[in-house]
């Protein structure tokens, strides 16, 4: 059993260490199917937000500051991303052209919209698109239940079933959905680049010296010129990703990524660790769990989702796909002394 409260304290302490130099902390929770990474990420988010809301009850909310400290132009967050600004006509053409669905070297494209925001698309097209935009008036409101932690699941970057239909071997693609090639890793990498850039924004905290807490630093330095980033999520009822299911706003000072391939040392996934490490504002947690335990959990999940008719069928499905993916990642995983290991058997 993972001690989420201990994780919360570690994350908040880590934010305090970087709060004078970095606007946000990026936390990565990595683990095989059935390891509990999604549950842990959500519980960690809730624990952090609950602690912050408790903090707000004890202070004068008038001390919350939201300013345009850095007068940020969102163009800087899409500059340096490989690709080019594209026309609507070219975007429409790409929707009908699935030649690139297996191309892990696909160059992501960006489109500037009339309101000045950008959409960034990879080989998965619009369903896996990212949007970078200015904060709305509603987002700038610091009244009510201001939350500072958000979760970004990797699941929103599953390639759609329509994309899988256009693989050279569509039967394999559908059978092995969840393997690394069946994700839009191109666009997920762009998301990591964007989030790393936002973490390097200099925070204008309202304290001198060191006599302040992490929550003091956060409350004194909300910068409403930091862009909002909209990210796809996976709709289980549709069995496909949908755009703009998660929003990271300027209030999101701790962003928790969760997924299987975040430390995978192949193709686009292999670049994530170095990109976020260069921001000096990251924490990686790798979840360990025995195969028997994750098999049991995933089989029950498959049965509950109606994907199989029995627990035994669920175990068979796990062994033919989920287990293969888990073993592949374990065999080809980035290792580093700063990756923290936690067990969830």
From Swiss-Prot:
Transmembrane segments: none annotated. ATP-dependent kinase that could be involved in endoplasmic reticulum membrane assembly. ATP binds at residues 31-39. It comes from Candida glabrata (strain ATCC 2001 / BCRC 20586 / JCM 3761 / NBRC 0622 / NRRL Y-65 / CBS 138) (Yeast). Keywords: ATP-binding, Kinase, Nucleotide-binding, Transferase. Belongs to the YFH7 family. Its EC number is 2.7.1.-. One of its GO terms (molecular function) is kinase activity. This is ATP-dependent kinase YFH7.
């Amino acid at each position: 059993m993972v001690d989420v409260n201990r994780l919360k304290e570690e994350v908040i302490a880590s934010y305090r260490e970087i709060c004078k130099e970095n606007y946000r902390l990026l936390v990565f929770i990595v683990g095989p199917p059935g390891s509990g990474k999604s549950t842990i990420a959500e519980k960690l988010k809730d624990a952090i937000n609950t602690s912050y809301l408790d903090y707000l009850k004890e202070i004068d909310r008038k001390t919350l500051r939201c300013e345009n400290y850095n007068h940020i132009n969102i163009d800087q967050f899409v500059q340096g991303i490989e690709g080019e600004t594209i026309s609507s006509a070219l975007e429409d053409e790409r929707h009908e052209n699935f030649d690139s669905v297996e191309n892990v070297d696909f160059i992501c494209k960006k489109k500037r919209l009339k309101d000045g925001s950008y959409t960034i698309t990879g080989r998965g097209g619009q369903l896996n698109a990212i949007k970078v935009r200015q904060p709305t008036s509603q987002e700038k409101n610091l009244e009510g239940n201001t939350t500072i932690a958000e979760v970004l699941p990797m699941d929103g970057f599953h390639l759609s079933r329509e994309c899988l239909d256009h693989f050279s071997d569509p039967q394999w693609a559908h059978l092995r959905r969840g393997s690394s090639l069946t994700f839009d890793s191109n666009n997920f990498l762009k998301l990591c680049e964007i989030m790393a850039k936002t973490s390097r924004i200099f925070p204008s905290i309202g304290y001198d010296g060191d006599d302040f807490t992490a929550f003091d630093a956060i409350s004194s330095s909300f910068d409403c010129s930091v862009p909002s980033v909209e990210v796809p999520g996976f709709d289980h009822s549709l069995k496909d990703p949908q755009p703009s299911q998660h929003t990271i706003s300027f209030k999101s000072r701790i962003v928790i990524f969760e997924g299987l391939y975040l430390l995978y040392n192949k193709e686009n996934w292999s670049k994530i660790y170095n990109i976020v490490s260069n921001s000096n504002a990251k924490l990686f947690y790798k979840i360990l769990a025995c195969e028997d335990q994750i098999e049991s959990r995933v089989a029950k999940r498959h049965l509950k989702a109606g994907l199989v008719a029995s627990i035994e069928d669920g175990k068979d499905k796990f062994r033919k796909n989920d287990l293969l993916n888990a073993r592949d990642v374990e065999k080809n995983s980035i290792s580093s002394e700063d990756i923290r290991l936690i067990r969830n058997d």
